[in-house]
């Protein structure tokens, strides 16, 4: 259903911390013009943890309205509590998003059975395309391939964003699930390797700054041209690394400010990128022809 370079959109903010609707709409237009294959609104990179519920839904709605069906919009609707995830997913449905991306519950650390029941309940209550999101480095929990396989027969669970840092997980999940789910890389630096193993694309931080190159790399890889894809990816390796010099989305918001696209404002407890990293990230932006 979804493939290629799916940008994990930042949420632009004004200097007073309010959401910058104009900059957000401009980002959507830019991504569509640059060839981004899908837009992921209000995930981790979109600062979902510090948005109020009304803001969260408003950002999804703005992205959907501006996209106007030209590319799919995937809404981040994960939450610690299952009932809250259901509420957010239903809200995304109401504003006409195309699918939901649900990070696994964090901090409360559910068991594998708890994860199974959590996602099953969301699927049963929402009947909407769901992409699981596994990122143990943030959630302190790991959605194991065997749990994905238990969920895979549910028609509404269509894929997983795999950000465990273990590229072999792509092959493990596909071996257990076949074509019942699609796997998407959640790690820009490993995206090319993941696609070689059968992933259908990447939910990307790097695409925020270099959308055309990320889309080109994915197009080549999914067409089987890994020589060409490696050549493109070589221009992006600095960004893959340096956009994580500090916690995401701190570096990528600074990068977009450096590119003249938006303010580098974040909400506390996130703070702007330390000046000691500026020149290194600036050089990676130059290498990727972003500035």
Curated annotation (Swiss-Prot):
Q: Could you tell me which SMART domains the record lists for this protein?
A: DHDPS
NCBIfam families, sorted? dapA
Q: Which InterPro entries match?
A: Aldolase_TIM, DapA, DapA-like, Schiff_base-form_aldolases_AS, Schiff_base-form_aldolases_CS
- The UniProt record lists the EC number as 4.3.3.7
Q: In which pathway does it act?
A: Amino-acid biosynthesis; L-lysine biosynthesis via DAP pathway; (S)-tetrahydrodipicolinate from L-aspartate: step 3/4
**Species:** Acidithiobacillus ferrooxidans (strain ATCC 23270 / DSM 14882 / CIP 104768 / NCIMB 8455)
A GO BP entry is:
diaminopimelate biosynthetic process
**Where is pyruvate annotated to bind?**
45, 203
- Which GO molecular function entries does the Swiss-Prot or TrEMBL record give? 4-hydroxy-tetrahydrodipicolinate synthase activity
Q: What is the lineage of its organism?
A: Bacteria, Pseudomonadati, Pseudomonadota, Acidithiobacillia, Acidithiobacillales
Description of how the protein assembles with itself and partners: Homotetramer; dimer of dimers.
Q: Where in the cell is it found?
A: Cytoplasm
Mind telling me what this protein is named?
4-hydroxy-tetrahydrodipicolinate synthase
Protein purpose: Catalyzes the condensation of (S)-aspartate-beta-semialdehyde [(S)-ASA] and pyruvate to 4-hydroxy-tetrahydrodipicolinate (HTPA).
């Amino acid at each position: 259903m979804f493939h290629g370079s799916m940008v994990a959109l930042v949420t632009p903010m004004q200097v007073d911390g309010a959401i910058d609707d104009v900059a957000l709409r401009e980002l959507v237009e830019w991504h569509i013009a640059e060839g981004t294959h899908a837009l992921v609104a209000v995930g981790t990179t979109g600062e979902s943890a510090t948005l109020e519920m009304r803001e969260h839904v408003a950002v999804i709605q703005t992205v959907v309205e501006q996209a106007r069906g030209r590319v799919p919009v995937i809404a981040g609707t994960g939450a610690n509590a299952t009932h809250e995830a259901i509420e957010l997913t239903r809200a995304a449905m109401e504003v006409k998003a195309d699918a939901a991306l649900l990070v696994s519950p964090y901090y409360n650390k559910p068991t594998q059975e708890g994860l199974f029941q959590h996602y099953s309940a969301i699927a049963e209550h929402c009947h909407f395309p769901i992409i699981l999101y596994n990122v143990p480095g943030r959630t302190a929990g790991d959605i194991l391939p065997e749990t994905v396989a238990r969920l895979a027969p549910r028609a509404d669970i269509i894929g997983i964003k795999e950000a465990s840092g273990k590229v072999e997980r792509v092959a493990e999940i596909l071996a257990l699930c076949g074509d019942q789910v699609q796997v998407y890389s959640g790690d820009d630096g490993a995206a090319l390797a993941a696609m070689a193993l059968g992933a259908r694309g990447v939910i990307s931080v790097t695409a925020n700054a270099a959308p055309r190159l990320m889309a080109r790399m994915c197009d080549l890889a999914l067409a089987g041209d890994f020589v060409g894809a490696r050549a493109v990816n070589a221009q992006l390796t600095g960004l893959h690394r340096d956009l994580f010099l500090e916690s995401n989305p701190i570096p990528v918001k600074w990068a977009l400010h450096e590119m003249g696209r938006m303010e580098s404002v974040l909400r506390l407890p996130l703070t702007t990128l330390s000046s000691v990293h500026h020149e290194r990230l600036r050089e990676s932006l130059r290498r990727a022809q972003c500035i």
